[in-house]
A protein has these predicted regions:
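Short, low-complexity N-terminal intrinsically disordered segments enriched in polar/charged residues
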Residues: 1-24, 28, 138-141
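A beta-strand edge to alpha-helix "cap/lid" segment located at domain peripheries
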Residues: 58-64, 68-141
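Soluble or luminal CAZymes and related metallo-dependent hydrolases
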Residues: 6, 48, 92
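Generic detector of well-ordered alpha-helical segments enriched in charged/polar residues
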Residues: 8, 12, 50, 129-136
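Short histidine/acidic/glycine/proline-rich micro-motifs that form metal-
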Residues: 13, 40-42, 85
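A short alpha-helix capping/helix-coil boundary motif
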Residues: 1-4, 32, 76-77
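A solvent-exposed, acidic/Ser-Thr-rich amphipathic alpha-helical stretch
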Residues: 24-75
Length: 141
């Protein structure tokens, strides 16, 4: 049985070094029926998780996670990260937090990402972004 600390360390290294060709290694880290959730996806199972990451590599140039803090308490880890990538020649950069649950075998049974999709994506869309900026400004006053 793998220790959860070792599982977390391996998971962090995988995410920081992940490339499209590494997606075949997802079963080394995720339980068969693991759940992955972020602001755009809520999927269950390695095949569906693979599709989420495959899509990320299709739509973004050089996506990269840089993990700068991780805390493990029992079977739950909280991981703070920076994400960078480019889409249509526009550079993306944002901070996020992941809550990751490990099972008894050291595999991820749940990975939930928290980050502000409205600021990172929707605010940059021409029509929707203008509306959201207007609403945000009105709410601030």
């Amino acid at each position: 049985m793998i220790s959860r600390q070792h599982a977390l360390n391996s998971y962090i290294i995988f995410f920081e070094q992940m490339k499209r060709e590494d997606l075949v290694r997802l079963p080394e880290f995720f339980a068969d029926q693991a759940r992955f959730k972020d602001p755009f996806n809520d999927v269950t199972g390695i095949e569906q998780i693979n599709k989420v990451f495959h899509h990320m590599f299709e739509v973004l140039d050089t996506p990269k996670f840089i993990i700068y803090e991780a805390v493990l308490e029992s079977d739950v880890a909280y991981i703070k990260w920076n994400f960078t990538g480019a889409s249509n020649a526009k550079q993306l950069k944002f901070v996020g937090l992941s809550r990751v649950v490990f099972n008894d075998r050291g595999l991820v049974s749940e990975h939930v990402d928290y980050w502000d999709a409205s600021e990172q994506f929707y605010m940059k869309l021409p029509v929707i972004g203008s509306i959201l900026r207007f609403i945000r400004n009105k709410a601030a006053n």
